Amino acid sequence: MILDFQFSIGYYLRVLELAIRDGTRILAYDRKRLLLDAWPVNDPLPTNYDTSVSTIRQVIHELFSWSAISYSISSRLLAIIELRLHEEKPQTGWLYRLFFPSKYHIKKAIVDKLCMFKSLILFESKRPVDKIVQAANKVFSKGKSNFSSWEDFTHEVTVSEVQTPLAGEVQRRLAADASLQMIIEALTTLLEGHTAYLPLSLELLNQFIGEKAQPLKTLSEKSYVLLRELIQLFSLSAEDFQTIIMSIISDSLSEVLANSLIGNQPLTFHGKTFVGLWQETALASPEDSKLALGFLAEVLRKVIVEKKLHVSKSDNTTPEEVGNIYSIRDQNPALWDKMITMLLMRWLLDYDRDIGIALRKAAEYYNPHPSFWRQFLRLWQRRP
């Protein structure tokens, strides 16, 4: 081992997340203490610290091979990296390189660091072998036997009829790993097929969200306030905007505060405030929160349908491939819901801006108390 696991897994993941989120820090490995550290990029690096890609690769491999880490954590980290790249990449264009060279080099270093993390974590998230081996070794650890090699196996070996049952905790871990691997493989099939599978993935989302959608109509005062606050949240924190929409649609908003990445809350102060407002409205005025939910789901569905119309259909998708996707729903509805939720989060990551614009237009059109100018514009404005 190259990491000291007397420190918790959560500690190492917090350090990794800090290095991802904070552009002024880099991930460094302390060879003397066998620890990870998020070191300030402008401070002199101690002699016992190593920041080479090969070392960081080994550290991340050992960390993500630990059976206590689920695939949801790696997916969450990858989502954070995508958001950070979305923020930093615009400042690495040729205009910045010509007119703001110092800022360009800073942002270029941040983007290179994020791309390195993305490739390493993505690779580890697709390689579950070590996790399964570790869990299996705890159960099937080889004890002392009466032969030392295959050549010595010349006598009968009787297996005791009384077999020690598997430890319950290890059984649950093995089942969870197998289930999550099924989800990852299904999502990989959906997302890596590009034009062949994108229409199918959009159709799956359309059906999932359509179950919650209601026809757009004039909002109540409280439902309008909820949606207006959600729209404002997009400008404050796009990550909160995506997470909260996913939680609302998947009926998991009550868990969003407790569903932290590594022991800390993923939401900002503004996101937590909005969750509290939605929960308070759901208790005091359930009809208003239901109206806001149906309105939001219908806006999402319309954006999905619009994107689906622009996708070129391909004949490469076979009935067998489609059947493999739907077989998950038949075998385990709970896993199917998790897969669709992960697919929804991925789609929100790509189209959050389109959703924010569409939601703003629809909410203003169905404002319960529109201004005179807004009423006048409605005469020529196309219904959302």
UniProtKB/Swiss-Prot annotation:
**Superkingdom of the source?**
Bacteria
Q: Which family does it belong to?
A: Belongs to the chlamydial CPn_0675/CT_696/TC_0068 family.
Which protein, by its recorded name, is this?
A: Uncharacterized protein CPn_0675/CP_0072/CPj0675/CpB0702
Task: Please report the organism this UniProt entry assigns to the protein.
Answer: Chlamydia pneumoniae
